[in-house]
Swiss-Prot record:
PROSITE patterns: IG_LIKE. The gene is KIRREL2. Residues 569-586 have a biased composition (Basic and acidic residues). It comes from Homo sapiens. Residues 21-510 are extracellular. Highly expressed in beta-cells of the pancreatic islets. Residues 1-20 form the signal peptide. GO terms for molecular function: cell adhesion molecule binding; identical protein binding. May regulate basal insulin secretion. Residues 545-601, 684-708 are annotated as: Disordered. Residues 24-118, 123-222, 227-307, 312-394, 398-501 form the Ig-like C2-type domain. Residues 553-562 have a biased composition (Low complexity). The lineage of its organism: Eukaryota, Metazoa, Chordata, Craniata, Vertebrata. A motif (Cell attachment site) lies at residues 149-151. This is Kin of IRRE-like protein 2. Glycans are attached at N143, N301, N484.
Amino acid sequence: MLRMRVPALLVLLFCFRGRAGPSPHFLQQPEDLVVLLGEEARLPCALGAYWGLVQWTKSGLALGGQRDLPGWSRYWISGNAANGQHDLHIRPVELEDEASYECQATQAGLRSRPAQLHVLVPPEAPQVLGGPSVSLVAGVPANLTCRSRGDARPTPELLWFRDGVLLDGATFHQTLLKEGTPGSVESTLTLTPFSHDDGATFVCRARSQALPTGRDTAITLSLQYPPEVTLSASPHTVQEGEKVIFLCQATAQPPVTGYRWAKGGSPVLGARGPRLEVVADASFLTEPVSCEVSNAVGSANRSTALDVLFGPILQAKPEPVSVDVGEDASFSCAWRGNPLPRVTWTRRGGAQVLGSGATLRLPSVGPEDAGDYVCRAEAGLSGLRGGAAEARLTVNAPPVVTALHSAPAFLRGPARLQCLVFASPAPDAVVWSWDEGFLEAGSQGRFLVETFPAPESRGGLGPGLISVLHISGTQESDFSRSFNCSARNRLGEGGAQASLGRRDLLPTVRIVAGVAAATTTLLMVITGVALCCWRHSKASASFSEQKNLMRIPGSSDGSSSRGPEEEETGSREDRGPIVHTDHSDLVLEEEGTLETKDPTNGYYKVRGVSVSLSLGEAPGGGLFLPPPSPLGPPGTPTFYDFNPHLGMVPPCRLYRARAGYLTTPHPRAFTSYIKPTSFGPPDLAPGTPPFPYAAFPTPSHPRLQTHV
């Protein structure tokens, strides 16, 4: 029943309203509005079925119902009131106009929804601190600060541009400068400028909703930067010994004030300016050349190393190695060069390559491996010299003993035996031994041992020693026995035998006697010929007429014996005249004899000799005897053949010799002129002459003796 009554009531109500007319209502209500400061704001309002009073309120304050809104000079209402149009206009809009506005139909009790009026204030052009030209130092971090001041609404956004390109926002940040003043903001751009940033343009733009295009402020960077250096070398690849020119170029703000050159960190003395000329060597490969350029801001340097081609240079030489027999040995050496050298190992004096590389290994060495090993480096480029270094391998082994040649010795004279010892390690002792004894050092009876270093060592066998065994007063047994020289060290013992050779005195004495006899004979022949010729020239007339004898008697005491040739005598008248010479030591006395005077005043003893000189006597009698007999036995060659020399004597009319030469008074007349060579005082057996082979028979008659 109740459900049926409700629709009926609604129908009746609708019919009643239709007869009374439409009620007042809003055809258009104001909406929120954003207006730039200084522009016009329009808030629309339209009512339907209302012909009463319409007014606007500002944040609840009624502005009035008249169209021109008295008291609000910048406000007015426009539109056809009959049509219900009541729009509110504000021009120019100011910041104080920002409020909430409502359109009200007072008599109908209608109020529109509130409309918020927002007044936008465009930002002013920002300011960059230090602009329009900002001076910075290249390489030093710096900040660019941009500020926007004023009552800009909303708060502006500050953006940075470089050469028209927006920079990343991560490089700057924005700060509100004053609370309640949204327009006062600041933006800081952090950057590290470089030399290429000199003259660059940076733009700070303040942008907001009030001014979407924003306002810009531009600045220019003026950079001070240390020198930027470029170092070049010409040529860059050279051979050792060639010239190289380094050129150091730099750009700087402010200008360059100085250059400094260095090589391997050490200053190059005398180098100034941007150009350096050098002669390349191997050190330029590992020691770069650097150029440092300075100005008021700072300094910068660049360095470069040359590609120097050079031959091998020894960096680590091989060290001597000493090992025992059977152990391994190794050598190592290091070379450098450009290009890298080829390293090989050989043995000194050999051509066989034992190995290559920096290390040579010799397994289980023996004594034959001892010696000098050569580490040789060959240049990797033709035209470059190689190099070599040596090291000695010493193989520790038992001593090596060698008997040295010893000179033969005379019986009962001194003798010496020597041996050479090489050993590594050095021998503990060197011992001489023979049948009945041994001696290491010092003396023992007739034996004396001396040991001293050898002048040279044999490669790889260790230092050398020479041990000498001296024997005084040799005996027959010394020439038949063996002498042993032995040496020992911690690895063993070595030895060698030496024997003593015997030397015969006779051949030497014979040679000396022959030479002395020949020399004496030659001198006497020359003297006789000279005397003959001289007398012949002085008394040729007298001697040609007379054939008397010139007789030289013995000494005044009459002790001299006369030979058969002296028995022929004559009267004083038969002998002819007495001849006196100025250059002879023979004086003819009144008795017809020649007296001998000592020309040496007694320094040499001249024994008296009686010689009969028969002038013109036929050969074969008196002074002229048969040719001398040889000094040796028949069938053996004589020491000196007198005949060839005496045959060369020119003929002398004084002697009228038919044989053509002067003979000796006795076959051994010249033996007394032989003077044996002294060989030292040997021990002689009792009753034995010192040199039995030099004791010649004494002639049976006196001989003329003098000193040669």
